[in-house]
């Protein structure tokens, strides 16, 4: 069992039959009354995100999540296909369940597949990925790194705000947690 006050971002727990992942957690002390825990949660099975509050002493069962390294193969007919790097077993995950993560993944990229028991509940991305810009506005002569930036569409469909000097065909390193441009690759 884990107390609500001990739940941190990234942890997964059971609330009744719901398998929930903590996206953000903070203590809140109102002017009157007791401290409460405000959390942004994601229902792992449905993919829905919502806000909830708990008392710090509320108890939950912590979910044991196992991970397996697998390679992303392809997506077809609403199913993303992955292959275990050690056993060559293939896993099928509904695209709807991992659509946000797939914006950072090219075919043949290694990811970690997360399991709760035998149920696939999601994928964990590497911290950074290298993607190629396929479309962006033309560069402005004399633009500097300190400019406000412009939107660029990556080869996976991800849209990232990039500095003005970036052109189509440039490979960029992208942070998968924040979706931000880090540097040229």
Curated annotation (Swiss-Prot):
- What Pfam families does the entry give? EFP, EFP_N, Elong-fact-P_C
User: Which organism encodes this protein?
Assistant: Lactococcus lactis subsp. lactis (strain IL1403)
Task: Give the Gene3D superfamilies listed for this entry.
Answer: 2.30.30.30, Nucleic acid-binding proteins (2.40.50.140)
Q: Which GO terms describe its biological process?
A: peptide biosynthetic process
Question: InterPro entries annotated for this entry?
Answer: Elong-fact-P_C (IPR015365), NA-bd_OB-fold (IPR012340), Rib_uL2_dom2 (IPR014722), Transl_elong_fac_P/YeiP (IPR020599), Transl_elong_KOW-like (IPR013185), Transl_elong_P/YeiP_cen (IPR001059), Transl_elong_P/YeiP_CS (IPR013852), Transl_elongation_fac_P (IPR011768)
Protein's job: Involved in peptide bond synthesis. Stimulates efficient translation and peptide-bond synthesis on native or reconstituted 70S ribosomes in vitro. Probably functions indirectly by altering the affinity of the ribosome for aminoacyl-tRNA, thus increasing their reactivity as acceptors for peptidyl transferase.
Q: Which GO terms describe its molecular function?
A: translation elongation factor activity
Instruction: Spell out the protein name for this chain.
Output: Elongation factor P
Location of the protein in the cell: Cytoplasm
Which SMART domains does the record cross-reference, listed alphabetically? EFP, Elong-fact-P_C
């Amino acid at each position: 069992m884990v107390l609500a006050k001990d739940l941190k971002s990234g942890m997964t727990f059971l609330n009744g039959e719901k398998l929930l992942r903590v996206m953000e957690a903070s203590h809140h002390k109102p002017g009157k009354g007791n401290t409460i825990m405000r959390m942004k949660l994601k229902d792992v099975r449905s993919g829905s995100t919502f806000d909830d509050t708990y008392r710090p002493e509320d108890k939950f069962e912590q979910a044991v999540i196992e991970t397996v390294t697998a390679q992303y193969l392809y997506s077809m007919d609403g199913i993303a296909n992955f292959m275990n790097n050690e056993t060559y077993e293939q896993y099928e995950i509904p695209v709807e369940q991992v659509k946000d993560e797939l914006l950072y993944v090219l075919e043949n990229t290694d990811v970690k597949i997360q399991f709760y028991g035998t149920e696939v509940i999601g994928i964990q991305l590497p911290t950074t990925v290298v993607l190629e810009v396929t479309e962006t506005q033309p560069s402005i002569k004399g633009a500097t790194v300190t400019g406000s930036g412009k939107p660029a569409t990556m080869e996976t469909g991800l849209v990232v705000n990039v500095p003005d000097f970036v052109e189509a065909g440039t490979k960029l390193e992208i942070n998968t947690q924040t979706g931000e441009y880090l540097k040229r690759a």
